[in-house]
């Protein structure tokens, strides 16, 4: 199954609370922190909401 490599490249400081919450729920704790998540519609939706703050790469398992 495909996975997504998500990296926080911009700080969520100064953005709306829901965007900060989305970054937190993705598991991104600090700048340049990377997590690997399953490629599901729910995760894609979260990434779409904060696409201006993160960098996303597809990874094959």
UniProtKB/Swiss-Prot annotation:
* Record Pfam families: Ribosomal_L30
Record-level Gene Ontology MF annotations: structural constituent of ribosome
Report whether Ribonucleoprotein shows up as a keyword of the record: yes
Signal sequence span is none
Q: Which InterPro entries match?
A: Ribo_uL30_ferredoxin-like_sf (IPR036919), Ribosomal_uL30_bac-type (IPR005996), Ribosomal_uL30_ferredoxin-like (IPR016082)
One of its GO biological process terms is: translation
Keyword hit for Ribosomal protein: yes
Q: State a GO cellular component annotated for this protein.
A: cytosolic large ribosomal subunit
Q: Which domain of life is it from?
A: Bacteria
Keywords (A to Z) from UniProt: Ribonucleoprotein, Ribosomal protein
Q: How does it assemble?
A: Part of the 50S ribosomal subunit.
The protein's matches in NCBIfam families, at most eight in alphabetical order, are given as: rpmD_bact
Which protein family is named in the record? Belongs to the universal ribosomal protein uL30 family.
**Name of the protein this chain belongs to:** Large ribosomal subunit protein uL30
């Amino acid at each position: 199954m495909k996975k997504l490599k998500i990296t926080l490249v911009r700080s969520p400081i100064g953005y709306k609370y829901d965007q900060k919450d989305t970054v937190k729920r993705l598991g991104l704790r600090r700048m340049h922190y990377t997590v690997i998540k399953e490629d599901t519609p729910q995760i894609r939706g979260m990434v779409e909401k904060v696409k201006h703050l993160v960098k996303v790469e597809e990874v094959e398992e």
